[in-house]
Amino acid sequence: MRDIPFRHSFIAAWLMALLLCSGTPAPASTPAQTPTPGPAVPAARVLLHTAQGDMVLALDPVHAPVTTANFLHYVDQKRFDGAQFYRAVTIGDDGLYGLLQGGLYGTRLQPFKPIAHEAPAVTGLHHADGAVSMARGEPGTAQSEFFIDIGDMPEYDGNGDDPGYAVFGRVESGMDVVKQILAMPRAADAGGADFHGQMLAAPVKIISARRVVAPVKP
């Protein structure tokens, strides 16, 4: 299973990030120049129609062109029709933070070839609440598995030699559906030692995935 590791040091790292961000920044020696904005490029929107409800993903083809094109290839080839959300990780007792992972795992659908890794340090896209990112083993092995952040997850942006995970969009609408799935029961005997307690007892089917032109009204 292509997957993201869950480090026990996450909460400590997250709290440290908050502490570092709380300091007063040093004044810049020279004012930054404001670049002249170019023509607006619309986000590529995808409607995921799931057994638990709909969610709309706004993808970023400007900052993450490779990863966005890969995801849209699965959409256009209808390869996500019949995919599923199967892994739900919660952090803390309140269950307000975590991630939801989906893709072709556990189905008979076959993935396309792996893609090049687009690191957050290069794209400028970060693991904020609602971010959509690629699951992978080593960098350059991502194919069909993706995850959605519930809450800010700065650790997954990477640091130093860690290239992080490739963010390529965000949930534009349907975070309530994401949270409903996150709260669903877990399988007691699935996931092995690494993912015990993280696999959904009843994976949620992605019935269809289609491009949409404009934001979908709730």
PLM features per residue range, with description:
Residues D3-A12:
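Twin-arginine (Tat) signal peptide motif
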Residues R2-D3, C21-P218:
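Cyclophilin-like peptidyl-prolyl cis-trans isomerases
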Residues I11-S22:
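Bacterial N-terminal signal peptides
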